[in-house]
């Protein structure tokens, strides 16, 4: 089965084709980072308009890359939420129209479920159940995954998502949007002993997160110190270390509470090398295994939507022709 996947939840237009026998056949991605950088964040109206401009050429390029004709597509999967409503409607409308024109099923996909499944695109599929740590610009969640579509939320951020905290702190350090990856690069040159930031909520029971206080601690430190290059590196190191330690502590706590030995790391922040390394060490010590995707499949992309669509079809998921999107959509719903 060949599934065309469409991703337009925020500021990336992604289109891909996944073949259930051959794997990923084609993957095209257009990023709007340069468009939004001058505003310091995503402008929803501009994002929607840019998706409209790029989506059809990307679909054509994807079909060409895969050497596949429309008649050889068996289903169309598209992101139905969560995300920016205008951006979601672009992908949903095009996806539905193509499915109708090609007389194939249309499959709405939950964006965070697609992130959760992304490591399985190329790696072995972990046995159920397992713990998933979902870390992105809009979400920070610990989820027990019992089967496709059967999710139990164990903990989540009570305020800022971890990716949002990275980007906001990067902005305070004078880095361009999106600054999370730049902050991680600065941190490589940081002095590990100069600043120490709090690890939020690790002394409380439960698996929820909070990053607003950590962001405030970073902001106060930035204001209190001269902003030479080394100081910026030192602050970046302290911030990143605090975030990674917090995520690792909560993840290990989730594993202990559930007795599980498999951990999936997914979402844009899962591309962070120090986070990957930290969790790999923890899972090795626990005689378990951590799964994560290649960096290119950690951020938003069409490949994860195509794959998630195929997995949903295997579970019997189908949809009518109505165009329905969900800007807010709990994974457990």
UniProtKB/Swiss-Prot annotation:
UniProt cross-references to NCBIfam families, sorted A to Z: gcp_kae1, T6A_TsaD_YgjD
Binding site for substrate: 134-138, 167, 180, 272
The protein's name in its UniProt record: tRNA N6-adenosine threonylcarbamoyltransferase
Keywords noted in UniProt: Acyltransferase, Cytoplasm, Iron, Metal-binding, Transferase, tRNA processing
Organism: Hamiltonella defensa subsp. Acyrthosiphon pisum (strain 5AT)
GO biological process: tRNA threonylcarbamoyladenosine modification
Pfam families for the chain: TsaD (PF00814)
Subcellular localization(s) per the UniProt record: Cytoplasm
Major location category of this protein: cytoplasm
Cofactor dependency: Fe(2+)
Entry superkingdom: Bacteria
Binding site for Fe cation: 111, 115, 300
Family: Belongs to the KAE1 / TsaD family.
Gene3D superfamilies tied to this protein: 3.30.420.40
Function, in words: Required for the formation of a threonylcarbamoyl group on adenosine at position 37 (t(6)A37) in tRNAs that read codons beginning with adenine. Is involved in the transfer of the threonylcarbamoyl moiety of threonylcarbamoyl-AMP (TC-AMP) to the N6 group of A37, together with TsaE and TsaB. TsaD likely plays a direct catalytic role in this reaction.
GO CC annotation: cytoplasm
PROSITE patterns, sorted: GLYCOPROTEASE
Catalyzed reactions per annotation: L-threonylcarbamoyladenylate + adenosine(37) in tRNA = N(6)-L-threonylcarbamoyladenosine(37) in tRNA + AMP + H(+)
Cited PANTHER family: TRNA N6-ADENOSINE THREONYLCARBAMOYLTRANSFERASE (PTHR11735), TRNA N6-ADENOSINE THREONYLCARBAMOYLTRANSFERASE, MITOCHONDRIAL (PTHR11735:SF6)
GO molecular function: iron ion binding; N(6)-L-threonylcarbamoyladenine synthase activity
Entry's EC annotation: 2.3.1.234
Comment on bound cofactor: Binds 1 Fe(2+) ion per subunit.
């Amino acid at each position: 089965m060949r599934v065309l996947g469409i991703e337009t939840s925020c500021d990336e237009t992604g289109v891909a084709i996944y073949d259930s026998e051959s794997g990923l056949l084609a993957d095209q991605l257009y990023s709007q980072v340069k468009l939004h950088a001058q505003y310091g964040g995503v402008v929803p109206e501009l994002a929607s308009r840019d998706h409209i401009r790029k989506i059809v050429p990307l679909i054509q390029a994807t079909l060409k890359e895969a050497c596949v004709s429309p008649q050889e597509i068996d289903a169309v999967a598209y992101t139905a939420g969560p995300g920016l409503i205008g951006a979601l409607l672009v992908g949903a409308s095009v996806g539905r129209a193509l499915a109708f024109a090609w007389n194939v099923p249309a499959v709405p996909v939950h964006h965070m479920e697609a992130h959760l499944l992304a490591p399985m695109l190329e790696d072995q599929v972990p046995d159920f159940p397992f713990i998933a740590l979902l870390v992105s610009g809009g979400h920070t969640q610990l989820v027990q995954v019992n089967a496709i579509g059967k999710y139990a939320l164990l903990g989540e951020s009570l305020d800022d998502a971890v990716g949002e905290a990275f980007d906001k702190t990067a902005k305070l350090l004078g880095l361009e949007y999106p600054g999370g990856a730049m902050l991680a690069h600065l941190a490589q040159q940081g002095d590990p002993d100069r600043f120490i930031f709090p690890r939020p909520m690790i002394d409380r029971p439960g698996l929820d997160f909070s990053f607003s206080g950590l962001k405030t601690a970073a902001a106060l430190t930035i204001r209190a110190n001269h902003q030479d290059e080394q100081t910026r590196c030192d602050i970046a190191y302290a911030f990143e270390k605090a975030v990674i330690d917090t995520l690792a502590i909560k993840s290990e706590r989730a594993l202990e509470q559930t007795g599980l030995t498999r951990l999936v790391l997914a979402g844009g922040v899962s591309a962070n090398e120090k986070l990957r390394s930290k969790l790999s060490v923890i899972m090795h010590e626990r005689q378990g295994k951590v799964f994560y995707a290649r960096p290119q499949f950690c951020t938003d992309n069409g490949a994860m939507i195509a794959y998630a669509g195929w997995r949903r079809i295997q579970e019997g998921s189908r949809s009518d022709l109505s165009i329905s999107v969900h800007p807010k959509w709990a994974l457990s719903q």
